[in-house]
């Protein structure tokens, strides 16, 4: 029962990790279904069911895999350790913000089971999501699921902000705090500011569907484009919410593996804050095709390109950290290097898409799918694997099998590239997103992509095997490498005590 009412940040972080990993398996299964459908021409199921799977895949991966693992799992576990706090600021609220997630997930699963399921895409645009096109309760259940997940995130965000601002050890100033803690801080501010807008938009959609209002119905003087503006005002900060903790983890692991402080720490902090602020003023680049004014499109093109500058600062700072260092090529370092390379590639396709004139042609094609999967599937997910490999000894006191972990990286690296690189070609050839069938001219790249997807499932299974093997063989961490400069290793015994590091303070030299 202690897991149900535990208020210890380590227990709650572990719960988040387990929940996120489990949902990650569900999301991976859904993605395999998508790729099996597209692996051959002809259809396995009908178009609506295909769209239900696509929608569920997106929601599960974003709200129930990446966010719980990165912010809930690594955030809860590491932030108190890194700032020298005994626990989070509001431990019971922390417990509640986790236990809101399983009901949210159950609601999402139920939404695909009632009527025909919610086949709207993750953006839930009206009029497709209106009562006219989706008459059953499925979209309503999906909306309630999002409400619960959003409440969970907002409670967690308040908790992290108060913890980081008020519970640092004496002498632990904000300049000394790890970049991972900074990334969580920026992320939770984004969550706190953007989620209420999403909640407003989907509540308006709920009343449109059930109470005959017409916020998004032109027949009653509403405008479906209003929904798009509200949704993307949340949706764009959301993609930075997914990647910023990854940035922090990469900086943290890189600093430890290169045995020195990350290059340009202050610049890194300012870059993250800039990305956070700019993320709020570029939302309409998702809507270049809705008939906006040319001046508006020019502004959003320029603003989107400016985000590339702080992102570039981060990439070059990572490269400068590696440059001239004696890097320890551990499994977590492999993931970090893979992250830097593939995230940069995804960023380059993002620059292409930020041009409104090009985006008119590429909008809703597989080029966009390839872009955001390079950033998420090889950015966020690679960062999660890097963090898991790096912090596994802190969380369990055991060590993973190093050679197997490296082999798993190689398999995964080949698999995800094989899955998503061909999709750039499909997009340039004009294959649209969210369709379950396609002309035979697209067959070759789709088949290659589906083989890659199958291979990535094997990579995930290999990961499960590695974790299982680590618990089975019980290789304890005997001593901590003296070159690991960061706070969470300083206790010297793992996992750390129930309330560790209560009496530690920092001396200015």
From Swiss-Prot:
Q: Which residues bind Mg(2+)?
A: 363-364
Q: Which cofactor does it need?
A: heme; Cu cation
This enzyme catalyses: 4 Fe(II)-[cytochrome c] + O2 + 8 H(+)(in) = 4 Fe(III)-[cytochrome c] + 2 H2O + 4 H(+)(out)
Stated membrane topology is:
Multi-pass membrane protein
Q: Which GO terms describe its biological process?
A: electron transport coupled proton transport; mitochondrial electron transport, cytochrome c to oxygen
List ligand-binding residues for Ca(2+): 37, 42
Q: Does the keyword Disulfide bond apply?
A: no
Q: Which GO terms describe its molecular function?
A: cytochrome-c oxidase activity; heme binding; metal ion binding
Q: Where does heme a3 bind?
A: 371
Q: Which domain of life is it from?
A: Eukaryota
InterPro entries linked to this entry: Cyt_c_oxase-like_su1_dom, Cyt_c_oxase-like_su1_sf, Cyt_C_Oxase_1, Cyt_c_Oxase_su1_BS, Cyt_c_oxase_su1_dom
Pfam families for this protein: COX1 (PF00115)
Question: Which pathway does the database say it acts in?
Answer: Energy metabolism; oxidative phosphorylation
Localization (cell): Mitochondrion inner membrane
Q: Membrane-spanning regions, if any?
A: 14-34, 52-72, 98-118, 141-161, 179-199, 230-250, 263-283, 302-322, 333-353, 380-400, 409-429, 452-472
UniProt-annotated binding residues for Fe(II)-heme a: 57, 373
Q: Tell me which residues bind O2.
A: 240
| Residues noted as binding Cu cation in the record, renumbered to the chain | 236, 285-286
Quote the EC number: 7.1.1.9
List residues of cross-link (1'-histidyl-3'-tyrosine (His-Tyr)).
Answer: 236-240
Q: How is the cofactor bound?
A: Binds 2 heme A groups non-covalently per subunit. Binds a copper B center.
Assembly behavior = Component of the cytochrome c oxidase (complex IV, CIV), a multisubunit enzyme composed of a catalytic core of 3 subunits and several supernumerary subunits. The complex exists as a monomer or a dimer and forms supercomplexes (SCs) in the inner mitochondrial membrane with ubiquinol-cytochrome c oxidoreductase (cytochrome b-c1 complex, complex III, CIII).
Q: What does this protein do?
A: Component of the cytochrome c oxidase, the last enzyme in the mitochondrial electron transport chain which drives oxidative phosphorylation. The respiratory chain contains 3 multisubunit complexes succinate dehydrogenase (complex II, CII), ubiquinol-cytochrome c oxidoreductase (cytochrome b-c1 complex, complex III, CIII) and cytochrome c oxidase (complex IV, CIV), that cooperate to transfer electrons derived from NADH and succinate to molecular oxygen, creating an electrochemical gradient over the inner membrane that drives transmembrane transport and the ATP synthase.
Q: Which family does it belong to?
A: Belongs to the heme-copper respiratory oxidase family.
Q: What is this protein called?
A: Cytochrome c oxidase subunit 1
Q: Which organism is it from?
A: Albinaria caerulea
């Amino acid at each position: 029962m202690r897991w149900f009412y535990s208020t210890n940040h380590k227990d709650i972080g572990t719960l988040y990790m387990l929940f996120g990993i489990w949902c990650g398996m569900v999301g991976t299964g859904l993605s395999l279904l998508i790729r099996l459908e597209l692996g051959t021409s002809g259809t396995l199921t009908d178009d609506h069911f295909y769209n239900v799977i696509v929608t569920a895949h997106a929601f599960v991966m974003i709200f129930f895999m990446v966010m719980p693992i990165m912010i809930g799992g690594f955030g809860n576990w590491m932030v108190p350790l890194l700032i020298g706090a005994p626990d989070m600021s509001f431990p019971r609220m922390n417990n509640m913000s986790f236990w809101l997630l399983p009901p949210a997930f159950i609601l999402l699963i139920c939404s695909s089971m009632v009527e025909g399921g919610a086949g709207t895409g993750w953006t839930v645009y009206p009029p497709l999501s209106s009562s006219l096109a989706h008459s059953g309760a499925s979209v309503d259940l999906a909306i309630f699921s999002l409400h619960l997940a959003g409440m969970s995130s907002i409670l967690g965000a308040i908790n992290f902000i108060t913890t980081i601002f008020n519970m640092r050890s004496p002498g632990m100033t904000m300049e000394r705090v790890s970049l991972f803690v900074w990334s969580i801080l920026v992320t939770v501010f984004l969550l706190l500011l953007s989620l209420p807008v999403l909640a407003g938009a989907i509540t308006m959609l709920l009343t449109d569907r059930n109470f005959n209002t017409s916020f998004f119905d032109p027949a009653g003087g509403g405008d479906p484009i209003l929904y798009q503006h509200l949704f993307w005002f949340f949706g764009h900060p959301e993609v930075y919410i997914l990647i910023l903790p990854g940035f922090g983890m990469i900086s943290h692991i890189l600093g430890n593996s290169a045995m020195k402080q990350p290059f340009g720490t202050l610049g890194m902090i300012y870059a993250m804050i800039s990305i956070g602020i700019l993320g709020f003023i570029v939302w309409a680049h998702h809507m270049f095709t809705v008939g906006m004014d040319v001046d508006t499109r020019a502004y959003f093109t320029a603003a989107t390109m400016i985000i590339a500058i702080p992102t570039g600062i981060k990439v070059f700072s990572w490269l400068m950290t590696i440059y001239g260092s004696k890097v320890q090529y551990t499994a977590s370092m492999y993931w970090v290097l893979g992250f830097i390379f593939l995230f940069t590639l995804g960023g380059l396709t993002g620059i292409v898409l930020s041009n409104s004139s090009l985006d008119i042609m590429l909008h809703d094609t597989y080029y966009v799918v390839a872009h955001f999967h390079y950033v998420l599937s090889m950015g966020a997910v690679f960062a999660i694997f890097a963090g898991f490999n790096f912090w596994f000894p802190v969380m369990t006191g055991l060590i993973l099998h190093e050679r197997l972990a490296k082999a798993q990286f190689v398999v995964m690296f080949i698999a995800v590239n094989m899955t998503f690189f061909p999709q750039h070609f499909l997009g340039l050839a004009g294959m649209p997103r969210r369709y379950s069938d396609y002309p035979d001219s697209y067959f070759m790249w789709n088949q290659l992509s589906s083989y890659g997807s199958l291979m990535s499932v094997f990579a995930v299974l290999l990961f499960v095997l590695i974790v299982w093997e680590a618990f089975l063989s019980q290789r304890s961490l005997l001593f901590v490498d003296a070159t690991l400069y960061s706070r969470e290793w300083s206790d010297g015994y793992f996992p750390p005590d129930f309330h560790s590091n209560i009496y530690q303070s920092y001396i200015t030299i």
